[in-house]
């Protein structure tokens, strides 16, 4: 399954409710399962982004549906990146002209 890295920032609402972030992370994992997405890791971070997740989804539509669903709750804004493993890159490079 494709791997995705999601970079998230708390909204004002998310910061006001920061004490609930661990509870929301568990709810996120449950929601992800409903979308067919497996959350591999969740990290809280310092710097430009507040949260980083690594997940696997069957396709872009599943990953996008999850991002829209979680964003609609109003606690975070997200940016999702498609990640490629070394094996993926080996295959890609092998297709180069």
Task: Write out the residue ranges for each language-model feature.
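A compositional/biophysical signature of low hydrophobicity enriched in polar/charged and small residues
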Residues: 1-97
């Amino acid at each position: 399954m494709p791997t995705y890295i999601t970079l998230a920032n708390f909204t004002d609402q998310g910061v006001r409710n920061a004490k609930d972030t661990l509870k929301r992370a568990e709810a996120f994992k449950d929601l992800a399962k409903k979308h067919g997405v497996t959350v591999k890791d969740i990290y809280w971070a310092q710097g430009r982004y507040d949260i980083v997740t690594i997940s696997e989804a069957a396709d872009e539509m599943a990953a996008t549906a999850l991002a829209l669903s979680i964003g609609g709750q109003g606690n975070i804004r997200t940016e999702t990146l498609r990640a490629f493993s070394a094996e993926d890159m080996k295959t890609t490079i092998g297709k180069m002209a």
